[in-house]
Structure formats: structure tokens, C-alpha cells
Amino acid sequence: MSVPNTTRMKRRPTHPGEMLREDFLPDYELTVSRLAEAVDVSRQSINELLRGRRAVSPEMSPRLARLFGNSPEFWLNAQRAVDLWDAAEAIKKDVARIKPLRTA
């Protein structure tokens, strides 16, 4: 039996929209409008993503991956980390009441 990973990050992972806003847009000299046009989505969708109000979806990840030369998994894994953190924070009191099983 393997030992589970019980370590927990102390802070919320960086939202992929923040990565886009702080790293990718400046590095590629992109505006919101140019990014929206490049990936063929609305400026509103990009704005919501950049502000962390929208998640990177399975439909958006290949668009971003193609544009920036990385993988859809890069974007989805970043989003998954945020989603897991948010879910764990929302139910942490409930989870704390669960008694772990012990092996015989």
C-alpha cells in the first residue's frame, strides 16, 4: 500500500488568469483585445478569465496552448489546482471531522 500525500499548500495556487495577466500578456505584448481575437473568443470572456471570475475550460485550454506553444494540460492543471484548493477550503471543517482509516 502506498503512503498518501498529506501535504497541503499554505496558500491558494495562482489562478491561470493571473498567470495570463501578469506573465503571458506582457511577455508577448498582448492586449485583452488581441488575445481575444487570437483565440477567437469574446473580450468579455478574456476579461473574466484575467480577473479570476472565469475558469479555464477544456474548450479554452487548447486555444491558449496553441497560441503560447504549451499544452492544454498546462492550463487545465493550473485550473484544477485552484479548483481543488477552493473546494478543500469550502469543506475543510467537514473533512476535519472524518476519521482516517488505519491498516490492519
Task: Name each model feature, range by range.
Residues 48-51, 77:
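Base-recognition residues in the alpha-helical recognition helix of bacterial helix-turn-helix
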Residues 53-66:
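Short, basic-rich loop-to-helix N-cap that marks the start of a DNA-contacting helix
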Residues 42, 53, 68, 79-82:
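The DNA-recognition helices of helix-turn-helix-type DNA-binding domains
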Residues 26, 37, 66:
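Alpha-helical residues within the helix-turn-helix
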Residues 1-3:
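General marker for long, soluble alpha-helical cores
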Residues 5-30:
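A short, Lys/Arg-rich alpha-helix, primarily the initiator
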Residues 76-104:
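Short, charged recognition helix plus adjacent turn
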Residues 29-48:
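Short alpha-helical DNA-recognition segment
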